[in-house]
Amino acid sequence: MDSQRNLFLVALLFVSFLIWQAWQTDHNPQPVAQTAGQSISDTASQAVPESGQGKLITVKTDVLALTINTRGGDIEQADLLAYPATLGSDTPFQLLETTPQFVYQAQSGLTGKSGPDNPANGARPLYSANQTSYEMLPGQDELRIPLTYTAANGVIYTKTFVLKRNDYAIAVDYKVKNDSHDALDLTLFGQLKQSVDLPKHRDTGSNNFALHTFRGAAYSSSDDKYQKYSFSDIEDKNLNVQTKGGWVAMLQQYFATAWIPHDSGVNTFYSANLGNGQAAIGYKAPSVSVAPNTEKVLSTTLWVGPELQSDMAAVAPHLDLTVDYGWLWFISQPLFKLLQLIHSFVGNWGFAIIIITFIVRGIMYPLTKAQYTSMAKMRMLQPKLQAMRERIGDDKQRMSQEMMALYKTEKVNPLGGCFPLLIQMPIFLALYYMLMGSVELRQAPFALWIHDLAAPDPFYILPILMGVTMFFIQKMSPTTVTDPMQQKIMTFMPVIFTVFFLWFPSGLVLYYIVSNLVTIIQQQLIYRGLEKRGLHSRDKK
């Protein structure tokens, strides 16, 4: 089997997979929503109403800039100060947003029969704060933002946001002081709501099949470590899952928001189609009773920031799975850890990709050698196979039987040239997932004109260089292709590859270029060995 045809087949499979994945992202099958005691309609009815008019409080740490609305105490805006919105910009990336064009908020509160956020009890609570602006000062490791609301029955609710230095996890504590004469029935909830349609200023790649990633909701439960729940799933059927522990989240490329319950009891995960083009996912903790003249503290945690795997894993089990490495996560995760290790020494993600390419190709050298040896043996059999075809004619069954007998006699595996390429395919895909999912590689520069390894080459130089390396491999490789149509396809294969890779991340194209250069070197070494065994001749191209 000819090596160029194998490469072309693998490339077509890869691109077809990416196109299928881009379609599947928006049309994926709906997960089965688990049901228990409470009906889905009851769960959806707990979706929080609009916050309405309230004062805006600004909060700033070394990594976050937040805007909190005193009506309900929701976080309506979150800027990630360490992550520019675009390459070279001084404007930080805005994760949470509340504008006429787009809404993405992190909401929390207390529902239940006595809850101030229960729609049946009127408008959401209007909290008061001692300041309108809070900022973490140098040398300060923790910033607390207390909001206070006193209900008509005398109950005092204090909602406190606790932020720490260099941390994207925000603790949200509710202190309930029941100075009334009646017991309170309260349920803590956390909810994330978002506009389904992206405005232009937030759409960074949905039209590029090679850069298309998942955007939507997700959750982790005792039954499912990680389950995506797309906006179309929310539109079709509201989620209703009863579970201990876990988390609910809204995801997009590189960034996530997530509510992590603290209660050890059974939490209810729900989703809701809110209308006005908005969808929500959230959780409700078990009901809590607060006796008269007593106090109780209810707590939860919000993650709002980049998908940093080690940090997220420390906040909640399986939260690091929100880094979308796809079905090859078991390859992508160790690849990324190795890449991180290399980067810690070389200080450049591009050079780290080059080094990891040499490592991967070095490990796979025995398979590569077996591939070329198998193809060389197949070429040596071509005269016998041609004579067999002339002798047998159109009897396909007899031809197949005698071919298998010949392969067995000559100890040749006809698939031996294809198998190593199929082994390389998952590694190539895993690297693609790693580049598209790892926020560490977002806007990571390499050298010269490459300022973002996760974005396509703006000048298309790397794809062209990749096509040139493929051309050299093609010219240096012996071929058994005699069909004129196949010969034309093989001739244009470097051009086809170049066009495919115009839209691919620069880091992936860099990997492929280096891999091709390694192939050229390994090819020459292997061919010299095959010449000594009489299995290859440089005169036969």
Curated annotation (Swiss-Prot):
Pfam families: 60KD_IMP, YidC_periplas. One of its GO terms (molecular function) is membrane insertase activity. Keywords: Cell inner membrane, Cell membrane, Chaperone, Membrane, Protein transport, Transmembrane, Transmembrane helix, Transport. InterPro entries: Membr_insert_YidC (IPR019998), Membr_insert_YidC_N (IPR028053), YidC/ALB3/OXA1/COX18 (IPR001708), YidC/Oxa/ALB_C (IPR028055), YidC_ALB_C (IPR047196), YidC_periplasmic_sf (IPR038221). Its main location: membrane. GO terms for cellular component: plasma membrane. The chain crosses the membrane at residues 7-27, 340-360, 415-435, 453-473, 494-514. One of its GO terms (biological process) is protein insertion into membrane. It comes from the Bacteria. It is found in: Cell inner membrane. Disulfide bonds: none annotated. It is a multi-pass membrane protein. PANTHER family: CYTOCHROME C OXIDASE ASSEMBLY PROTEIN COX18, MITOCHONDRIAL, OXA1. Belongs to the OXA1/ALB3/YidC family. Type 1 subfamily. Interacts with the Sec translocase complex via SecD. Specifically interacts with transmembrane segments of nascent integral membrane proteins during membrane integration. Required for the insertion and/or proper folding and/or complex formation of integral membrane proteins into the membrane. Involved in integration of membrane proteins that insert both dependently and independently of the Sec translocase complex, as well as at least some lipoproteins. Aids folding of multispanning membrane proteins. This is Membrane protein insertase YidC. The lineage of its organism: Bacteria, Pseudomonadati, Pseudomonadota, Gammaproteobacteria, Enterobacterales. The gene is yidC.
